[in-house]
Amino acid sequence: MINASLVAMEINNCLPAMEIPRETENYEGFYHLISMSGDVAEAHLNYIIRDHDASLFEAKKATLCHIEKIMNEKWGAGTVQLTITDQYRNMAEIIKKCMFLIENAVKACKNTNIPPLILPIRGGTDGCMLSYMGLPCPNLGTGGHAYHGPYEHITIE
């Protein structure tokens, strides 16, 4: 008998333990287990993958494909079924062509005596998708905290 919940745990344990949001920062990529469900017969793991570097992002997807292959060799063909859906790509390659947007924002901050603070955004945003649709939308002034968790919020002072 194959216990699907135990196979799911094994899959998660195959991922690099230090490449999770809690253990990474700034431009470091990660695997983020956002939901899981299961029992003896069937289990589901749902991850998001983030990386600012396109080649490292692709490598993370390849790692998941490799884990699927290993698990199916161990437990039998079709035991593990991986679906990868691209939902987010780093918008830097689009924004680099439109740096005047960032320059204008920095200038506006300086004109109002607000020191500009430029930090990486570590999650997917609507602006990313809009940027790839032809409307460059850099992330400006998110003000957010505790992303991807139950206490994610933005202060509206």
List the predicted regions and their residue ranges.
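Metal-dependent amide/peptide-bond hydrolase catalytic core
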Residues: I2-E157
